[in-house]
Design a protein with these regions (language model features):
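Sec-dependent signal peptide recognition
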Residues: 2-7
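Short, linear, compositionally biased motifs with a strong N-terminal bias
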Residues: 10-11
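N-terminal structural segment of carbohydrate-active enzymes
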Residues: 19-133
Length: 133
């Protein structure tokens, strides 16, 4: 008798399924998990665009372009990097064309790798990618 009750209870428990709520929740900024990324430092997805505008002067340590670009960001999105972290909003540094020459701020030559030394607000800096990216 105990065996029958055990089997009946086991069958009942294993046959019960849970209902999944598949309704997608709307995005709200209040619930956002924001990821800030410095585009040039994030992921180099296209090594062919690493040097543009003859930006060949040796920069001080960590003061030059390192190669991160739109292609690298797209690769990480496609690999679910952000969604695996629970990220649903990305804040990127500006991608507009930066000044072409290096500047010495007292720490050695520095390029506008950070995106905040805009030269042309209407063009993408080719170090970061193209409009096709």
């Amino acid at each position: 008798m105990k065996k029958i009750l055990f089997l009946a209870g086991f069958a009942l428990l294993t046959s019960c399924g849970s209902v999944q709520n598949t309704k997608k929740q709307p995005f709200t900024w209040e619930g956002a998990n924001l990821y800030f990324l410095l585009t040039d430092r994030f992921q180099n997805g296209d090594k062919s665009n690493d040097i543009n505008f003859e930006r060949t002067e040796k920069a001080a340590v960590l003061r030059g372009f390192e190669g991160g670009d739109l292609r690298g960001i797209i690769q990480k999105i496609d690999s679910n990097y952000f969604s695996d972290l629970g990220i649903n909003a990305i804040w990127m540094t500006p991608l507009v064309e930066q000044i072409h020459d290096a500047t010495d701020e007292g720490t050695g030559k520095t390029y506008g790798f950070h995106g905040y030394w805009a030269k042309d607000w209407t063009e993408l800096d080719p170090n970061f990618g193209t409009k096709a990216d």
